[in-house]
């Protein structure tokens, strides 16, 4: 039905007859000539109909926005005065000779031109219309090109695209599973995979030493701007490769991807340990475009007569950190109060501050409600450590070390945005040497997942002192977002059993949930390592979208619902009976 895409017609086609199909973006009658902007996924082209062909002209006069039409005509150059430099096809137009209305359109329930006026609910309910917007179409086309480039790279490096099951077994991987009831085995359930983790490890044990898959994953978790109940991973696993080799290969892939798609050279990725990232930036995925850093000052404050500082300073699990904001002395008291409320979201009890109005006047040039508790030597050392100057403000977080990291790390990001301090467009890095475990409410939990290998210890040494062990894990971070995370996997049954015991998984529970894995580890398992990238997040960053919902064709809302199809929905009683399921209705509460 077409000879060219609308957005592909250019000056090289002048004089040629073309057949185009698409949607009417805009139609206007100017002085007896109908101008039609025809749109398809590749862009817009202007079509002109004049009264010399009355039958066609009359049809053109009836066109309205979003009619689906076929156009036949001859390409001609626009006069210089009418060239539109803002359009890809702005040097030409098509003189229409024939016109077929394939389908008319009713008035749209949402605006495609002023989409900002559409609610998120509207955009998702009428997603098939929202996707007609050039911005949305370009993002999905960009996504397709990225996945094609990823496949090319991995194929050319000997990786095999192998599918793994979608109906599988529930395993504890950190989030709730989506469960699928079995009709054949009443009362039993499949789970949709949170990742192909165990199957890709089993593929390594099967001898397929380089695997990849662009795969759907499912997690029933509380949603945020960068989370969806179903999302896509670039999943990679290798045998007989060290963590350094996996990092080098996947960094090569990511650098090549940015160069091909955006003409951006990311350069060599720096390395940073987890401890350094948390100490300097309060985050294990630091945004290095932001020059602000947290500075430890607890050692200076152990003996001050101000319990807010001295308490955490003398607590092994406490921390006092200073954050210098250049030019921050201009902050009003209300703005400081707003920052105090902001850190309160992360559990901080308050925010101390020190304005450096004029350092030439010594302490007289400093304004702070805590200044009376600090001698001149302490103040000068804080100023020296933070590199603060006249006109700056120093903000202090004092609390449990975790609270300080989370609250001051978040404040660092907010202040960087508020004061326009971000430097450069792309700042990648690797974060390495993660703790093997973290303690939550007295119990150990895996920082990555239970199949991550510790670095340089025996199973006995790991169980004897799990709190201080480092994992052979690595995260790729870009502009404060985790692009992907991976690790060397445990390939020894004794080590895997030790990790399960540390996590409070009994031998019986391990056998019930992971018996197939423990069995497989007995039969010559090779050393293996891998990594999984969040494809949606990568596309979001590369296109500048504000949410992964804007780079997915049919995403869910933040409450994990689909307004387009009204999913999830109720099952009919017959289906439930076949599955052996009865629904317990919530009791009504009286007003």
From Swiss-Prot:
It comes from the Bacteria. One of its GO terms (cellular component) is cytoplasm. ATP binds at residues 219-221, 228, 482, 534-537. Its main location: cytoplasm. Its EC number is 6.1.1.12. Keywords: Aminoacyl-tRNA synthetase, ATP-binding, Cytoplasm, Ligase, Nucleotide-binding, Protein biosynthesis. The keyword Cytoplasm applies. It is an enzyme of class 6 (ligase). One of its GO terms (molecular function) is nucleic acid binding. SUPFAM superfamilies: Class II aaRS and biotin synthetases, GAD domain-like, Nucleic acid-binding proteins. Residues 197-200 are annotated as: Aspartate. It is found in: Cytoplasm. It catalyses: tRNA(Asp) + L-aspartate + ATP = L-aspartyl-tRNA(Asp) + AMP + diphosphate. L-aspartate binds at residues 173, 219, 448, 489. GO terms for biological process: aspartyl-tRNA aminoacylation. Homodimer. NCBIfam families: aspS_bact (TIGR00459), PRK00476.1 (NF001750). Belongs to the class-II aminoacyl-tRNA synthetase family. Type 1 subfamily. Catalyzes the attachment of L-aspartate to tRNA(Asp) in a two-step reaction: L-aspartate is first activated by ATP to form Asp-AMP and then transferred to the acceptor end of tRNA(Asp). This is Aspartate--tRNA ligase. The lineage of its organism: Bacteria, Pseudomonadati, Pseudomonadota, Gammaproteobacteria, Alteromonadales.
């Amino acid at each position: 039905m077409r000879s060219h895409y609308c957005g592909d017609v250019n000056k090289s086609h002048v004089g040629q007859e073309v057949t185009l199909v698409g949607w009417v973006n805009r139609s206007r009658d100017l002085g007896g000539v109908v101008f039609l902007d025809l749109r398809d996924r590749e862009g817009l082209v202007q079509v002109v109909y004049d009264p010399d062909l009355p039958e066609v002209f009359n049809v053109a006069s009836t066109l309205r926005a979003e009619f689906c039409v076929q156009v036949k005509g001859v390409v001609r150059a626009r006069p210089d005065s009418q060239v539109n430099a803002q359009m890809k096809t702005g040097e030409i137009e098509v003189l229409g000779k024939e016109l077929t209305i394939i389908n008319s359109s009713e008035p749209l329930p949402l605006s495609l031109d002023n989409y900002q006026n559409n609610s998120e609910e509207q955009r998702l309910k009428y997603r098939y219309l929202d996707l007609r917007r050039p911005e949305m179409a370009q993002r999905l086309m960009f996504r397709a090109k990225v996945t094609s480039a990823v496949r090319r790279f991995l194929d050319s490096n000997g990786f095999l695209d192998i599918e793994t099951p979608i109906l599988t077994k529930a395993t504890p991987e950190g989030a709730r599973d989506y469960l699928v009831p079995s009709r054949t085995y009443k009362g039993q359930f499949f789970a949709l995979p949170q990742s192909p983790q165990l199957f890709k490890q089993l593929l390594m044990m099967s001898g397929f030493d380089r695997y990849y898959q662009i795969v759907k994953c499912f997690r029933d978790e509380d949603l945020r701007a960068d989370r969806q109940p179903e999302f896509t991973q670039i999943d990679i696993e290798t045998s007989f490769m060290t963590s350094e080799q996996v990092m080098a290969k996947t960094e090569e892939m990511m650098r090549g991807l940015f160069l091909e798609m955006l003409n951006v050279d990311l350069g060599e990725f720096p390395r940073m340990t987890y401890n350094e990232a948390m100490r300097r930036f309060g985050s294990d995925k630091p945004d290095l475009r932001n020059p602000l850093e947290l500075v430890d000052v607890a050692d200076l404050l152990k003996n001050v007569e101000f319990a807010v500082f001295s308490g955490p300073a003398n607590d092994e699990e406490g921390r006092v950190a200073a954050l210098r904001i250049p030019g921050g002395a201009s902050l009003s008291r209300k703005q400081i109060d707003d920052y105090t409320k902001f850190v309160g979201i992360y559990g901080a009890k308050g925010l101390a501050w020190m304005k450096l109005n004029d350092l030439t006047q010594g302490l007289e040039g400093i304004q702070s409600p805590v200044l009376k508790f600090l001698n001149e030597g302490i103040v000068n050392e804080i100023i020296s450590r933070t590199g603060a100057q006249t006109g700056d403000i120093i903000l202090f977080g004092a609390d449990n070390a975790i609270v300080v990291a989370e609250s001051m790390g978040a404040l660092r990001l907010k202040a960087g945005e508020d004061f326009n301090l971000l430097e450069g467009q792309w700042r990648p890095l690797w974060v390495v040497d993660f703790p093997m475990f973290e303690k939550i409410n007295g119990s150990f939990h895996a920082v990555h997942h239970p199949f991550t290998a510790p670095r340089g210890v025996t199973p006995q040494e790991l169980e004897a002192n799990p709190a201080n062990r480092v994992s052979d894990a690595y995260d790729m971070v870009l502009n404060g977002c985790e692009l992907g995370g991976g690790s060397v996997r445990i390939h020894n049954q004794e080590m895997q059993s030790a990790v399960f015991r540390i996590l409070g998984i009994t031998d019986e529970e391990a056998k019930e949930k992971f018996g197939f894995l423990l069995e497989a580890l007995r039969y010559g398992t090779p050393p293996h390592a891998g990594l999984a990238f969040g494809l949606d997040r990568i596309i979001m960053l590369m296109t500048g979208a504000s949410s992964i919902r804007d780079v997915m064709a049919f995403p869910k809302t933040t409450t994990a619902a689909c307004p387009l199809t009204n999913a999830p929905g109720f099952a009919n009683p017959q289906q439930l009976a076949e599955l052996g399921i009865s629904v317990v209705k919530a009791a009504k509460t009286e007003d």
